[in-house]
Amino acid sequence: MINITLFGYGGMGRAIEAAADVRADMSVNRIFDFDGSAVYCAREGKALSDEAVIDFSHYTMHDEALKYALEKNIPIVVGTTGLSDEQISNMQEAAEHIPVLYSTNYSYGILIMNHLIREANKYLSEWDVELAETHHSKKKDAPSGTAKTMLSILNEDNSKTEVYGRQGITGERSKREIGVHALRG
């Protein structure tokens, strides 16, 4: 049985807990969450040892999850979005000591879409690109981590300027722009 420590108890955290509850080979042993000001232990399990950390927390809580995994010397799976460049760099450094798996979206469909964007970008690099995403009203980051990943694929060579939203009289669109729009509702 794999004893999991879960950081983040929102929609994904609850889904992970529910999935683990029906499996005989894994158990969510501890749950840590963020109340807006501090990280607290929402559930303390009976197992003496943790064997993996799953982090689907708010980006402000991610440092605690990574620190916990490093202190326990156990693997960490990270699905938290909105991470800073420094936090991503810290994960890369941690990967020299423990297994780290990070993605802004673990959906197989998004993996395929990212591959298709990368391939299309090879042939359509001179086309005007606007990236527009729509999410539910409870989505906390805008643009989402998935949209940011797609944006980084579209601008791998850093030759384009990202323009977030447009308002008023903006003039002619530059050829080296990528428009980024996030809708919630």
Indicate where each model-derived feature is located.
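Beta-loop-alpha module in the N-terminal Rossmann-like domain of NAD(P)-dependent dehydrogenases
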Residues: 49-71, 82-87
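Rossmann-fold dehydrogenase core element
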Residues: 75, 90-107, 124-132
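Short, acidic/turn-prone active-site loops that include or flank metal/cofactor-
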Residues: 34-37, 81-84, 105-106
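Structural motif
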Residues: 7, 56-57, 79-80, 103
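C-terminal substrate-binding/catalytic lobe of Rossmann-fold NAD(P)-dependent oxidoreductases
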Residues: 3-7, 11-47, 125-185
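Short hydrophobic/aromatic-enriched beta-strand-loop microsegments
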Residues: 28-29, 73-80, 99-101
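Rossmann-fold NAD(P)-binding glycine/threonine-rich loop
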Residues: 67, 80-101, 111, 115-120
